[in-house]
């Protein structure tokens, strides 16, 4: 699956994890990491990638009965906000929050994320 270099992989991960604005701030760091980092086990990365693409746990979501907080990101180009909405629709009684101006790595990009999680855990 992965045919490029480690540097290509790092940049691709960053590009899909962050908003365009945030990626602009981190792109040089990821390029440096890509230059000095190495893929230790290419086969393992391929297995993980295939698992991400083929794994379907939708049937198990209806078996979740504990309080569940789903926090999605408006600009998530990995799962999309629709992915978070889909989880919410299948987990009875779940709470859904979509944070604006965030990408897939919303936990790193939005201070509101930590506040929302803390409020949920304390409730």
Predicted regions and their residues:
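The feature captures the conserved acid-bearing segment of alpha/beta-hydrolase catalytic domains
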Residues: 56-65
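Conserved alpha/beta-hydrolase "acid-adjacent" motif
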Residues: 77-83
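Active-site acidic short loop of glycosyltransferases
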Residues: 65-66, 93
């Amino acid at each position: 699956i992965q045919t490029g270099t480690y540097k290509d992989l790092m940049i691709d991960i960053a590009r899909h994890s962050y908003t365009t604005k945030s990626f602009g701030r981190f792109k040089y760091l990821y390029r440096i990491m890509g230059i000095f980092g190495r893929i230790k086990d290419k086969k393992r990365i391929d297995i993980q990638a295939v698992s991400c693409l083929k794994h379907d746990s939708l049937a198990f979501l209806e078996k979740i009965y504990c309080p569940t907080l789903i926090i999605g990101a408006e600009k998530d180009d990995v799962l999309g906000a629709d992915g978070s909405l889909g989880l919410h629709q299948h987990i009875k009684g779940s709470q859904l929050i979509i944070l604006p101006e965030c990408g897939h790595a919303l936990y790193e990009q939005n201070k509101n994320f930590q506040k929302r999680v803390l409020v949920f855990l304390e409730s």
